[in-house]
Design a protein with these regions (language model features):
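Short beta-strand-centered aromatic/proline hotspots
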Residues: 787-791
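Short, solvent-exposed secondary-structure boundary/capping segments
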Residues: 793-806
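Short conserved beta-strand and strand-loop elements enriched in small hydrophobics
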Residues: 772-782
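Long, C-terminal catalytic modules of enzymes
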Residues: 512-610, 831-862
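N-terminal export/assembly segments and adjacent metallocofactor-ligating motifs
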Residues: 1-273, 325, 438-440, 484, ...
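Glycine-rich phosphate/diphosphate-binding loops that line cofactor/substrate pockets in enzymes
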Residues: 122-141, 191-200, 309, 330-345, ...
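Long, well-ordered, tryptophan-enriched scaffold segments
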Residues: 228, 232, 237-340
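Extended redox/cofactor-interaction regions of prokaryotic respiratory oxidoreductases
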Residues: 155-223, 227-232, 258, 366-483, ...
C-alpha cells in the first residue's frame, strides 16, 4: 500500500528501502475487495533512451512476475522521476509478439521462414566462422554494429580481446557533428551543462521534452528556472520547450551559427568578456588568421583581431540569414554576458545533426562559454568526461594493430565516429565484405537513410556471409538476418552505465530482476536465460561464451580475457566480472557497502546506483600528481610532455591537468583543421547549410548568389519531382517514443501513432489552400513519400517538418513485427534498384495472449520517411546531414497514404556527389587520423599510419 509521508517540505510516494524486500500493496484489479499483494522491489536501469534513469521493478512474490516499474529515488540522476518510457518497460517485457527463443533462417534471406534453434548451435556456428576469419587474417570481416549501446566499455574490451578492429555504431546518424565541434574545443565529445545552478540557459533543442538525457536534464532546467534562471530556445519549431522559454528564436535551419556569432560579436564589442579566462585557458597564442599572427603579439592585439574577424556578424546580418530579430539577438547576448560563469547551454542533435557543417554552431556556442568564462564552472558548461565515470575491469586487452577502412575510410579522416551509414555504399564499391556481422539495438533498414540500399546489401550472401540480429523483438532489419537472437530488455540483463546528466559522477547498475529475485529465493542460476522469459539471454554472458567458442583451448590468446580473476582457467561469471569492478574500480564504494555489512556487488544489487563524487568543477586546474611529473619536460608554450605526449600544462607556476587537447587548453584556433586541409575553419565560423535558401534556388536553376558548390552539393531532382521547394526537418522527436525501441510499448503508441507533415498556413496557401488532413506528396532526391498535412503556425514559413519515430512496416500480415505500431505493406522491387511500398492495412486489433490487442482502436502507423533520404556525409565530421531539400505537392489521384518510392541508383550517385566534398587523408606524418582525436576501441598508434 502506497505510503505518503512528509519529508521536509515534500511528499514521498516511494517505498522506503528497508521495505523493498517485502512491500505490500492492494491489488487494483481486485477492487473493491482489499487483496494484498507482496512484492520484492529490485532496482535496475531503463533502456528506452540513453539517460540510464533508475527503475524499480515490483516482482510479485506469488507469481514471480514483474507487475510494474517505477522510478528509483536512490538514483543520483533521475531521482525517482521517470518519463512515460520508464513505466512502459512493463509493456515491452510482456509483449506477446516478442522473440523468446533463438531463431534460424530456413529459407532465402528476407523470406520470413524461421525455425527455433539452440544457443549452443549459435555459439558453435559463429565461433567457428570467427575463428577461421581471424586465423586467416580476415579479422576486418568480423563486425559488431550497435545502435545505442546501453553499456560502458564491455564491447570495446571484447573486440580488442579478439584482436580485431570491428566496432561499428550509429553515432554518425545521431550526434557526430555536435561531437566534432566539442572535440575541436576540448577533446571531450559531449557537453555536460549545469542547468540547476545556471542564471541563463540557452537550448538549441527541444530539451524539456525530448532528446539526449532529457529527463534528468529537464528536471534541472526547471530547478534552474525555479531559482530565477532565464531560458532561451532556438528552434524552427514551436516545441513544448520553446513554449516555456523567455526567448524563442525560430531560426531558419542551418543559420544558427550566424546567430551565435552575432551574439559573440556583441559580447566582444561591448567588452563584456572574461579576458583573464580567455588569456589563460585558450590557445590564442597559436592563432593565425586574416594575416594576423598571434605569436609575439599581446592578448589585446589578438582580441582586436578577433573583433575585426567577426565584424561582419552584425545582429542585422544574423537576422537576414536566420529570421531571428536583431533586438532579440542583442538582448540574449547581454543576458549571456550578465550570467557570466553561470551560463549553461545544450546542443546535441537538432541543428548539429540536420545540417551540412552542423558542427559549426557547436564551435560558436562554446565560443560564448569561453567569452564568459563559463567552462567547468558552477552553473556553466562542463565536459562529459568530468561528469561520467567508466570503471575498468580486472584485465584490459591491448589495442588492436589493424585498421578497418569499412569503419574509418580515408576520405573522412576527421570523422567523429565510424562512417556507418555508408557501409552498403563502401561494400558496393568493392572495399570489403562481412563474414560475420552482428547487429544489436540496431535497425538500419528503418532508422537509417537509404534503407533500401541496406536491404540490397543484407540479402546478398556474397557480401554478408552470416548475420545475427541481437534483438528482443522482430524488426525490419532482423527480417534479413540468418539468426535472430533474443536479448533482454532493461530489466533482463546486466550493464554498467554512467552519463553526464548533471554536476556529479555516478554509475548505474542494470540487472536482470527475475534472476535476482530467484537468487534471493535460494535458487541457483547459472545463466540469465534460465530466469528470463523463454530463453531470452543477455549480451554479457553471450559474449563471454562466444569468446570461449572462438578460442576453446586458449591457443589464440582470446580466452584468457574471459577467465575468472578468482578461479584461474575457469570461465568468468557476470557476478565475478561486476563484483571485481565494484571491489576495485569504484572509489568509495567498498567502504560505503561495508557500513551496511554488504559486499560492493550486494550493495549495487540493493540500490542500483552509486554516486562517486560531486567534486567535478574546474578539473582543468587539478594539480598533476608528483609521480606523474617524473621524466616530464615543459615546452616553450607551457605544455608538459612525457615521452613526447602532452599530459598537462603550466598554469602560471603550477603543473595542472588542463584539457586533453594538443595545447592542453581550449582550442579557439584549431591547428588540427589547418594541418588536415581545412584552414578556412580554424576559428569558429559560419557557412551555409545544404538546405540554405540558395541551395533551394540552385536546385531549380534559379539565381543563387550565396550558393557555393565548393561546400554545397547541388540537388538534382528525379524527373517526376514536382511542387514547391522547402526545407524538411525530419528528426524532431516525440516525448514518448525512441527510435524503433519503443515500437512494442502499446500504451506509448496509443498516445502517439501519427506523423503528419507540419506546414505553415502561409505555405499551405501556396500549395493550393492545403488543409489539415489533405494528402501531400514529398519528393526527395531519390524518391518520394505520401502523408497527411497538418497546418500549424508552430513551424517557420519555408520549412516543413515530420517526426522521426513513426512509419513501421511488415511485409506479411501475420508477422509478429510490433503489430501495435506497424502497417502491413506490399513491398516490391519493380526494377533494378527501384523499390515501391504501399500500405495494405494499418494497425488493426488482433488475437494474442494479451487481451489488449483486441482493444486497439487506432489504425494509423505513420509513414516511413527515412528510407526515402540519400546519405549526406559531412566532409569533416562524417555526420549524416538529416535535413532535406524537398518538393511538396498535393498528392495525385493514384497516390495513397503511406506510398513510398526509392531509386537506389540515384542514392549511390548522391553518395558519390557528397564524397567529392571530402578532403582525404593522409595528414601530417602519413596519418589516417589525428592521434589525439577520441575513437571507440582505439587501435595502437602504429595502426594510424598508412602502410607502405
Amino acid at each position: 500500500m502506497t505510503e505518503f509521508k512528509r519529508e521536509g517540505s515534500h511528499l514521498s510516494s516511494c517505498p522506503p528501502v528497508e521495505k523493498w524486500n517485502d512491500w505490500v500493496e492492494y491489488d487494483p484489479e481486485a477492487w473493491p475487495r482489499r487483496v494484498a499483494r507482496h512484492y520484492q522491489i529490485i532496482p535496475t536501469i531503463c533502456f528506452n533512451c540513453e539517460s540510464a534513469c533508475g527503475l524499480l521493478a515490483y516482482v510479485d512474490k506469488e507469481t514471480g512476475k514483474v507487475a510494474k516499474f517505477e522510478g528509483n529515488p536512490k538514483h543520483p540522476a533521475s531521482r525517482g522521476r521517470v518519463c512515460a518510457k520508464g513505466p512502459a518497460v512493463i509493456n515491452q517485457i510482456h509483449d506477446p509478439d516478442r522473440v523468446l527463443y533463438p531463431m534460424k533462417r530456413v529459407g532465402p534471406r528476407g523470406g520470413g521462414q524461421w525455425a527455433r534453434t539452440s544457443w549452443n548451435e549459435v555459439l558453435e556456428t559463429f565461433g567457428a566462422r570467427i575463428r577461421k576469419a581471424i586465423q586467416e587474417g580476415r579479422g576486418e570481416e568480423v563486425m559488431y554494429h550497435v545502435g545505442r549501446p546501453g553499456y560502458d566499455f564491455i564491447m570495446e574490451r571484447t573486440l580488442q580481446a579478439w584482436g580485431i578492429d570491428g566496432h561499428n555504431s550509429h553515432t554518425n546518424i545521431c550526434s557526430a557533428s555536435a561531437r566534432f565541434g566539442y572535440v575541436l574545443w576540448h577533446h571531450a565529445d559531449r557537453p555536460s551543462p549545469d542547468h540547476a545552478n545556471a542564471r541563463f540557459i540557452l537550448l538549441l533543442s527541444a530539451h524539456l521534452e525530448s532528446g539526449h538525457y532529457f529527463n534528468p536534464h529537464a528536471q534541472r532546467i526547471i530547478d534552474g528556472k525555479m531559482a530565477g534562471a532565464k531560458l532561451a530556445v532556438m528552434d524552427p519549431r514551436l516545441s513544448n520547450t520553446a513554449s516555456m522559454a523567455d526567448y524563442w528564436m525560430p531560426s531558419y535551419p542551418g543559420t544558427e551559427a550566424a546567430v551565435l556569432l552575432a551574439m559573440a560579436k556583441v559580447i566582444l564589442d561591448e567588452n563584456r568578456f572574461d579576458a583573464a579566462f580567455m588569456k589563460n585557458w585558450t590557445n590564442w597564442e597559436e592563432a593565425e588568421f586574416d594575416g594576423f599572427q598571434a605569436k609575439g603579439q599581446s592578448f589585446r592585439a589578438f582580441i582586436e583581431a578577433l573583433k575585426r574577424h567577426y565584424a561582419k556578424f552584425t545582429p542585422e546580418f544574423a537576422e537576414k540569414e536566420s529570421g531571428v530579430k536583431a533586438e532579440i539577438i542583442v538582448k540574449t547576448a547581454r543576458e549571456i554576458a550578465a550570467a557570466g560563469s553561470r551560463f549553461a547551454s545544450h546542443l546535441w542533435r537538432g541543428s548539429a545533426s540536420g545540417n551540412l557543417g552542423g558542427w559549426q554552431p557547436v564551435r560558436a556556442l562554446v565560443l560564448l562559454h569561453v567569452l564568459t568564462g563559463s567552462v567547468g564552472t558552477e552553473g556553466g558548461h562542463s565536459l562529459n568526461a568530468w561528469n561520467k565515470f567508466v570503471p575498468r575491469p580486472f584485465k584490459v586487452p591491448p589495442p588492436q594493430t589493424r585498421w578497418n577502412e569499412l569503419l574509418y575510410p580515408p576520405e573522412w579522416p576527421l570523422c567523429t565516429h565510424e562512417m556507418s551509414m555508408l557501409l552498403p555504399h563502401l561494400i558496393k564499391e568493392g572495399r570489403g565484405r562481412l563474414e560475420a556481422y552482428f547487429t544489436r539495438v540496431f535497425n538500419p533498414v528503418w532508422t537509417y537513410p537509404d534503407g533500401f540500399s541496406w536491404i540490397e546489401m543484407l540479402r546478398d550472401e556474397k557480401l554478408v556471409g552470416l548475420h545475427a540480429a541481437l534483438t528482443p523483438t522482430w524488426n525490419e532489419t532482423a527480417w534479413y538476418a540468418d539468426y535472430v537472437l533474443p536479448m533482454g530488455y532493461s530489466s533482463e540483463r546486466h550493464d554498467l552505465m554512467s552519463q553526464e546528466t548533471h554536476a556529479s559522477k555516478w554509475i548505474g547498475f542494470r540487472q536482470p530482476v527475475l534472476r535476482v529475485f530467484h537468487e534471493k529465493q535460494g535458487k541457483k542460476v547459472d545463466y540469465t536465460y534460465q530466469t528470463n522469459p523463454g530463453e531470452v539471454w543477455e549480451e554479457d554472458e553471450f559474449w563471454i561464451n562466444l569468446s570461449w567458442a572462438i578460442d576453446p583451448d586458449g591457443s589464440m590468446g582470446i580466452r584468457q580475457w574471459f577467465e575468472s580473476p578468482y578461479r584461474p582457467g575457469q570461465k568468468i561469471t557476470v557476478d565475478e566480472y561486476y563484483g571485481w569492478i565494484f571491489e576495485n574500480s569504484v572509489p568509495g564504494l567498498p567502504d560505503t557497502a561495508k557500513k551496511e555489512n554488504l559486499t560492493p556487488l550486494a550493495y549495487m544489487r540493493k540500490y542500483g546506483a552509486y554516486e562517486v563524487t560531486t567534486d567535478v568543477y574546474k578539473l582543468n586546474e587539478k594539480p598533476l600528481p608528483a609521480a606523474d611529473l617524473t621524466g616530464t619536460e615543459v615546452q616553450p608554450n607551457g605544455v608538459i610532455t612525457k615521452q613526447g605526449k602532452p599530459i598537462g600544462v603550466m598554469d602560471h607556476d603550477k603543473a595542472v591537468a588542463g584539457y586533453n587537447t594538443p595545447s592542453r587548453k581550449l582550442e579557439i584556433f584549431s591547428k588540427t583543421l589547418v594541418d588536415w586541409n581545412w584552414p578556412e575553419f580554424a576559428l569558429p565560423e559560419y557557412y551555409r547549410s545544404h538546405v540554405d535558401r540558395s541551395a533551394q534556388a540552385a536546385s531549380l536553376g534559379a539565381p543563387a548568389a550565396d550558393f557555393d558548390p565548393k561546400y554545397m552539393p547541388l540537388v538534382d531532382w528525379p524527373k517526376d519531382a514536382r511542387g514547391e521547394v522547402f526545407t524538411l526537418l525530419p528528426i524532431f522527436r516525440l516525448p514518448t517514443l525512441i527510435h524503433t525501441r519503443s515500437g512494442n510499448a502499446k500504451l506509448l503508441y496509443e498516445i502517439a501513432h501519427k506523423n503528419p507533415l507540419w506546414v505553415n498556413p502561409v505555405d499551405a496557401e501556396k500549395l493550393g489552400r492545403l488543409r489539415t488532413g489533405d494528402l501531400v506528396k514529398v519528393h526527395t532526391e531519390i524518391g518520394f513519400f505520401v502523408l497527411h498535412a497538418w497546418i500549424t503556425e508552430g513551424i517557420t514559413p519555408g520549412v516543413v517538418a515530420c517526426s522521426h519515430h513513426l512509419g513501421r512496416w511488415r511485409v506479411n500480415k501475420e508477422d509478429h513485427l510490433e503489430r501495435f505500431s506497424s502497417a502491413w505493406v506490399d513491398l516490391k522491387e519493380v526494377g533494378k534498384g527501384q523499390w515501391k511500398m504501399r500500405q495494405i492495412t494499418g494497425v488493426e486489433p488482433y488475437d494474442s495472449s494479451d487481451p489488449d490487442t483486441r482493444r486497439v482502436w487506432w489504425s494509423d502507423a505513420g509513414v516511413h520517411q527515412d528510407i526515402t533520404f540519400p546519405v549526406h556525409p559531412d566532409p569533416l565530421s562524417g555526420m549524416h546531414c538529416w535535413h532535406q531539400v524537398v518538393r511538396v505537392e498535393r498528392a495525385n489521384k493514384e497516390d495513397r497514404y503511406g506510398d513510398i518510392f526509392v531509386d537506389t541508383n540515384l542514392s549511390h550517385a548522391v553518395y558519390q556527389k557528397w564524397k567529392s566534398l571530402a578532403r582525404p587523408a593522409p595528414g601530417p606524418g602519413n596519418l589516417r587520423r589525428p592521434l589525439w582525436f577520441p575513437r571507440v576501441a582505439r587501435p595502437a598508434d602504429a595502426a594510424y599510419n598508412f602502410q607502405k
